Amino acid sequence: MELLHSGKVRDVYADGDDLILVASDRVSVYDVVLPTPIPEKGKLLTALSLWWFDQLAELVPNHVLSATDVPVELAGRAIRCRRLEMVPVECVARGYLVGGGFAEYQRTGVVSGIELPRGMVEAAALPEPIFTPSTKAPVGEHDQPMTFGEVVDKVGAETAERLRQITLDVYRRGAELAADRGILIADTKIELGWAADGTLTVGDELLTSDSSRFWPAESYQPGRAQFSYDKQYVRDWATRSGWDRRSPAPEVPDEVVDATRARYVDVYERLTGERWG
């Protein structure tokens, strides 16, 4: 296998006509990779992605060829995939006002060019899910919000509309399935690319704790920060630590590592109904 790309969290290898996508235990916050891994994180993300790819297979095609035809040393954290020509846009759907979207709303009253009702509080449910794309920045740089018009300028009107529709369809169906299991999906990011036949196809990961914000429905209360089954716990620690959000990042304390892993395990078990390990 030939290493093609090493990203913040995933490594991509070429294996003949296919790709081998490997999820590491690395964790990134504020677009910087932290020096401390989260044990089994890569396997948890891979298992949850595969579950979602299966759940949403009739809604949108995905890049998975096999989860078992991979090198034995990578079993559980690698997927054999078809090659895609990736779209140069991060496709994000939001159902709740949180994170960077809430910060932008506080400053301007809009999110990615979409005007929202006045007086909304942190974590408020949006009137309907919205498409809030961003640029794809290199490792170490920050993604920047885009308006839909900017996406049109980058990829054309027809493709931009398809990106928006697929992203929102995936979010709505994912949110519906998660709600049945007591989980709210606040927002999610998906990667889309063109397959060899020109079909827009989901790649990378899907609806995981790295690409989404998951909240327990039973404790949801707008107007405050939510308990989150994702890397928000690490983000919060990084914010409190006094780190300037530039490399090199500090080591993550053991208690933060353990609590983060527990959240990844909990949401996997709640969503899939399967025991981890």
Swiss-Prot record:
The keyword Kinase does not apply. It catalyses: 5-amino-1-(5-phospho-D-ribosyl)imidazole-4-carboxylate + L-aspartate + ATP = (2S)-2-[5-amino-1-(5-phospho-beta-D-ribosyl)imidazole-4-carboxamido]succinate + ADP + phosphate + 2 H(+). CDD domains: SAICAR_synt_Sc (cd01414). GO terms for cellular component: cytoplasm. It is an enzyme of class 6 (ligase). The keyword ATP-binding applies. Disulfide bonds: none annotated. Its EC number is 6.3.2.6. Pfam families: SAICAR_synt. Pathway: Purine metabolism; IMP biosynthesis via de novo pathway; 5-amino-1-(5-phospho-D-ribosyl)imidazole-4-carboxamide from 5-amino-1-(5-phospho-D-ribosyl)imidazole-4-carboxylate: step 1/2. Keywords: ATP-binding, Ligase, Nucleotide-binding, Purine biosynthesis. GO terms for molecular function: ATP binding; phosphoribosylaminoimidazolesuccinocarboxamide synthase activity. One of its GO terms (biological process) is 'de novo' IMP biosynthetic process. HAMAP family: SAICAR_synth (MF_00137). Belongs to the SAICAR synthetase family. This is Phosphoribosylaminoimidazole-succinocarboxamide synthase.
